[in-house]
Amino acid sequence: MSAFTRRTILSAIAASGAGIAPSVSRAQQSAPAESPGARFSYDDLIKKAADIAAAPFDGNVPPLPEALAKLDFDAWREIRFRPDKGVIGKQGSPFTLQTFHLGHLFKRAVKINILRDGLSTPYLYSPALFDYGKAKFDKPLPPDLGFAGFRVHYPLNHPKNTDELVSFLGSSYFRVLGRGQQYGLSARALSVNTGLLDNNEEFPFYREFWIDAGDANSDHVTILALLDSASLTGAYRFDVFPREESVVEVTATVFTRSPQQGIGMAPLTSMFFMGENDRHYNDRNHYDDFRPEMHDSDGLLIQSGKGDWSWRPLKNPFIQKVSYFDASDIRGYGLAQRDRAFDHYQDIELAYEARPTYWIEPRGKWGEGRLELIELATKDETADNVVLAWRPKEPVAPGKPFSFGYRLTALLEDARLSPAGRVVNTFSAPVGALGSGEQGGPGSRRFMMDFAGGDVGFHLVDAGAVEVVASVSNGKIVRSFITPNAKVNGLRATIDVSIAARTSTDMRVFLRAAGQPLTETWVYTWNDE
């Protein structure tokens, strides 16, 4: 993966004031003077993307003024948008726009246009929009400089103050927040060739945006985006609805310049360094940190085309690992942060317990395809090391539009998504308690998972009526059993697994009662390393 990751973007946004700056009073914001513009719609954007795809790719990035290009991170983060300059849609619209300045790692300018009543007006760069802090320039910056990206603010957590709702900065990344949430993982418009061992991933990027903030009665903001890369172009529409669980309705039409086998739809990017299920980096490297866990997401949640639910805890592998999941006509998937207990993280500033889950629901049937989960080894929590995307089975052919849509929901609790019991903890340990007669031996390991929610708690007083249904792709299950766990109002399932040295096995476990599934299926891979 590129060194220019979402984690870099996250750090940059935080340093520029997003997520840590005080909320802005709506009374402080002003609207620019109306000016005439050309009519523009999503259909016009589709035509524009098609025309660009038919022409040779232009990857040229005009150089920044020397003084701006030389800014280090500390100097660049001194440049902050002036909140009182926030652009409002029509008079009284609850949505306001703030832009990010070019410089440091952000060298490719994007164009921004404001849509009002279907008319497009360019939103032009001006030094008056920014407070430059300690950053000084010998010469005035050019008036056609452009922007690195933008964010939209809305009274999300308080009726009189605005908070950041959604941001677009770097490549094709975007992020959205619901009420009481703090930025963690990111979404992308599209991925290309992610996970290739030759590190030949392509990063599509936004060239231009059109933003419609509506009027005083608007319940959403619409963002049109033109995507481009060496292999393809894309016309994207993001309808962003601020809520307790904010929603982004994504509509996309992609045009490829050549047949593309490696397109990833609705990709997500996150970080998992250490959790209760995977502490090997700490254990083997004597990692010295007060925080017990560090992750933006702790698992992959899937609802299959048949309606079955499964949960795959994330890991920080020793080497890059790619996992595939059959996902034909998939109903939903996402990277989730299930662990909401502060004392599991102990990080007052970063608040991992408030990081959102992003849940993806396709609009219509996507057909045959698979989910691709990529987990990269990381030595700390600053690197994004988890990528997830849905890949169609058939290559995307040039010469015709490839269209799809989906809903992205930013939520804190995923229990409402499924009535089944959920996995709330995953642990592993040597087989047999200290001093017991149980024998493990080489190539054996014990795995424990706590199930709670749904009807699981009903069986606390009669755990014997519940069956552990377990299978492995390699090796054998030596034993399995259930223990009531009142601490989670649920049941702990335990399996002891044995495999040959230096091999791996895929494990699946769910609970069954009266012949019916009681829980989602726990899915996990164990490598005997």
Predicted regions and their residues:
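N-terminal secretory signal peptides and thylakoid transit peptides that target proteins
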Residues: 1-16
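Boundary at the C-terminal end of the N-terminal hydrophobic targeting segment
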Residues: 25-27
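Terminal accessory/anchoring regions of large secretory-pathway or extracellular enzymes
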Residues: 30-73, 80-82, 100, 350-529
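Solvent-exposed N-terminal domain segments of exported/luminal and surface proteins
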Residues: 56-196
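A contiguous, surface-exposed recognition patch within enzymatic or periplasmic domains that forms
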Residues: 74, 167-169, 181, 261-403, ...
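Extended, loop-rich substrate-binding clefts of extracytoplasmic carbohydrate-active enzymes
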Residues: 186-243, 363, 367-375, 379, ...
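Acidic, contiguous internal or C-terminal segments within carbohydrate-active enzymes
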Residues: 225-274
